[in-house]
Amino acid sequence: MLKIKNILTCAISISLFLMSSTAADATQTAEDLRNSDISKLVKQSKFDSRDYGIVTPVRDQGDTSLCWAYSTASASETSILRSGIDKSVDKSSLSLSPQQIGYARHNRGSDPLNNTTGEITSSSGNWSYAGGGTKYAAALLSTWCGPVKSDKAYNVNGWSNAAYKLESAISVDGKNLNKDAAAREKMKRAIVKYGAVTFSYNNVREAF
């Protein structure tokens, strides 16, 4: 069983390093990135994790409410490739199941590690439309209930089928990125150091 060094979750109003869905060929390797000086990379005018071959392909969530689970799975994949903890996978072969994350968020049992004591999950209807968030995902993965590989069934036992184990999750405050230079520096450093971040925002819909 391998351990994920870090999965980042953050709530930000503006994405700092925009990444398009167009695939790019890696110009350097993940090993090059691991051997680079983070402080120097942060000061560059541009940083793109795709240049190092650590960004997995874009996936379509369909009409589900699992954007947060897809984001968590993708950030986890990049973190794994960035850290180099699993030499048997690359950006083409590593695929974690967002469906398992979504299902387990609303259908899991007790936490054997007691990392989420007191948390109450209450949802009705189809779990794939029940919603969630990246902080909820970090809480779930802190119990080691997943992540599982995409070739597993979404309702598989997450504890016995976890492909990796989360060691820590880091939250970066991104509320003032467009005004606070120090906040932007911290966000840049997080992206460079861990390869990716997730972010959440609340889109309130009004009917007329």
Protein language model regions, located:
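Catalytic-core signature of thiol
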Residues: 25-208
